[in-house]
């Protein structure tokens, strides 16, 4: 029984990670009319991933590195622990609103805490999933996904109302346990958790594909491939990126951003 609860806790912690879908997608296709190198402003909102939780120095935060790489000033308004509802409310904060209005690009990292804040529902759902099969999503869990989609859509719309010319970047959720050997009885933790991560990414994909000037940066493949990107081990449950992980995120962000700039 202890092993079962530990396994459920591991899967739940995966869902703290932040969030989006598969490819770089936007109705506009490319970034146009962007300020020159050295005159750019990036604003970040979201959760602990963007906030750089666990780092000794914010100079190692992937958003700091990314902004430096593209010649931009960074305003980081992300707050550890925020879920999508709290991020939505934060848009009315005076500093956050001002930073959004002055930004050329806004990075959004949010999603995992919507599930972590409802851990009782998720633990029950994970127990039921083990009994009923991998495709089983109880109504209570489906409601969390639905609420998240509504909040993310409102976040994007509010940003657009404040700054219609800005580009919005949403990043994917990664799974830090895919390269670890976390197994309980016949259950592979990484693969089991991936169902919930994939469903969350699908929710974000459904929202992002309807929005103009919104790009999705898929960081998951690069992050999932290297266990050194994460603090977590078989003995320590921690999904946050290490300094190495932040460097990986920064590289992926920089490559994808530069690839979207119109020639």
Features from the language model and the residues they span:
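Solvent-exposed loop/turn segments at secondary-structure junctions
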Residues: 48-51, 79-85, 112-116, 174-178, ...
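Structural recognition of the beta-strand scaffold that forms the well-ordered cores
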Residues: 41-46, 74-78, 104-109, 167-172, ...
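Short amphipathic alpha-helices and their capping/turn segments at secondary-structure boundaries
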Residues: 29-37, 87-106, 154-165
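Positively charged n-region of N-terminal signal peptides that target proteins for export
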Residues: 1-6
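Oxyanion-hole/transition-state-stabilizing segment in secreted/luminal serine hydrolases
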Residues: 88-145
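C-terminal motif of bacterial Sec signal peptides marking the signal peptidase cleavage site
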Residues: 17-20
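Serine-esterase "nucleophile elbow" of acetyl-processing enzymes
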Residues: 25-80, 96-98
């Amino acid at each position: 029984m202890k092993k079962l609860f530990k396994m459920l806790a591991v899967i739940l912690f995966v869902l703290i990670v932040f969030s989006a879908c598969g490819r770089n997608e936007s109705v506009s296709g490319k970034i146009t009319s962007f300020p020159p190198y050295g005159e750019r402003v990036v604003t970040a909102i979201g959760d602990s991933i963007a906030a750089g939780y666990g780092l000794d120095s914010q100079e190692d935060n992937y958003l700091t590195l990314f902004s430096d790489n593209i010649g931009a000033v960074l305003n980081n308004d992300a707050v550890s622990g925020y879920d999508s509802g709290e991020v939505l409310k934060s848009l009315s904060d005076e500093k956050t609103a001002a930073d959004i209005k002055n930004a050329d690009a806004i990075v959004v990292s949010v999603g995992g805490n919507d599930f972590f804040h409802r851990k009782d529902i998720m633990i029950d759902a994970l127990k039921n999933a083990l009994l009923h099969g991998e495709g089983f999503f109880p109504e209570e869990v489906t409601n969390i996904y639905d609420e998240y989609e509504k909040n993310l859509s409102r976040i994007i719309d509010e940003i657009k109302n404040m700054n219609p010319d800005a580009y919005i970047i949403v990043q994917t959720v990664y799974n830090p346990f895919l390269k670890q050997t976390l197994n309980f009885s016949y259950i592979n933790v990484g693969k089991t958790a991936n169902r919930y991560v994939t469903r969350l990414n699908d929710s974000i994909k459904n929202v992002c594909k309807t929005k103009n000037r919104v790009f999705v940066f898929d960081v998951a493949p690069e992050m999932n491939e290297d266990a050194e990107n994460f603090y977590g081990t078989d003995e320590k449950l921690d999904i946050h990126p290490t300094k190495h992980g932040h460097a990986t995120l920064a590289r992926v962000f920089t490559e994808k951003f530069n690839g979207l700039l119109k020639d």
